[in-house]
Amino acid sequence: YIIGEKMSENLLSSLNESQKIAAQHIDGPMLILAGAGSGKTKTITTRLAYLISIGIDPRSILTLTFTNKAASEMRERAFSMLDSSMINTPPLLCTFHKFGLLFLKFHMSELNRKNNFIIIDTDDKKRIIKSIDKEITTSLLVAEISRYKNSLLTPSEAKSAAQLKLYQQIAEIYEKYEEYLEKNNLVDFDDLLLLPYKILKNNQKLADEISQKYQYIMVDEYQDTNELQYRLLRLLCSSHSNLCVVGDDDQSIYGWRGATIKNILNFSEHFENTHVVKLEENYRSTDTILNHANQLIEHNRDRLGKKLIGTRQKGDSIRIYESQDENEETRKIIEDIKQLIDSGTNPKNIAILFRVNALSRSLEEGFNKAGLNYKLVGGMKFYERSEIKDLIAYFRILTNSNDNFSIKRIINKPKRGIGKTTIDKLEAKSIESGKSIFDLIQQLDSEEIGSIVGKKNSRTLKVFEASILDLKELLNESKMKFFDSFEETFDYRASYDNL
């Protein structure tokens, strides 16, 4: 390892001039306009390492990304540049939502709520909304509620702003949805940003403390930020102006989920004395591709302006093929792939990109018929799988018996004859008594439960209760013993083997 000043110099040695300027900038706002393939990640990870190498406390640095993958990659690359002794207390490098989660774990009490809240995903959100309203399309309700939150609109403000009857109904559903979340101590993904914003907005002392804690803030993919994220950043920078954002005003494609290009276009107006650095040298694409890209993007009116310069060879010409339908398109792609392979191209160097997963069907069928092996990248994420969400719901119940949301999910998984009508009756009694569904099952005897859901269901629920209580006792014992008992009790493996 190279220590101290020599290390700082060495960190910058592999950067071009524009990258060096960006990496060495310390105080004051900075906008790094980074074109595709211009070494954006290399620049900001080097800047992170550089700040630490010149003696800035790693704990005072906050770097926010949009994906866990980006955060992990940056962390690995930045830390590999430094002596391990310099990062005994590493900087916080995470997604916006992870930062919000960490913040709420410490400060949820500011909203008079407990910090053992449960995060729901999109499927959970849909189920809750569907239980509130079955007339309006669920996907519309999900999108509008998310839009309200990211626009900082409360249910009452959404009602006031609604001019059409449909949107008045949506605002009312939004209000009921928020009441449900609060009552069950649930938060959705939007809340992971909205609730920290509300807390900081209403507590200037806390906002100052957090801002003084994180003296140097960096944000990746700034063109994809929305109004809520911008407002949150303003609060995080309330005691200083050391905000460095990296983005490409030519790559803003997430307007459909609330991102606003104005955040990056107006950054210099939002933050006075902004230092703007343009990364225009492209290390990824051939000159042919860059020339076409530059000519195309010049027609974009809303941009700050930059021109990508190639560092590689000219490359092959771009070919555009317009097909009549997906089958003809697939035939043409297969024909081209076979020609490439016959001419000596390694199949591993061939990739097909498509915008939505549904477009893969025709290609997969065509490849199978043609005898071409392929690897499909993507698909359902591990934690989105139904069986994994069921298991997580079980573990939530084991640690928090007040979690009605989770118990409704797993009370009949694996199937034990408890239907929707029984669950609805239990929930109604839970609301009436002010007790959770599990506490209700636990505190009432079989006869009392039978009067609510019938004798057969009463016996089933009491067996379910006993199983949960037995597992709770094992929770603090050996992990293997607990999981063996869990699998034996609920026979989950057999249940999913039969799917």
Each model region followed by its residue ranges:
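A basic/glycine-biased coupling hinge at the interface between accessory DNA-binding modules
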Residues: 2-4, 9, 27-30, 35, ...
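Helicase P-loop NTPase motor core
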Residues: 32, 36-44, 108, 114, ...
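Short alpha-helix plus adjacent loop in nuclease-associated cores
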Residues: 99-107, 250-255, 284-285, 376-399, ...
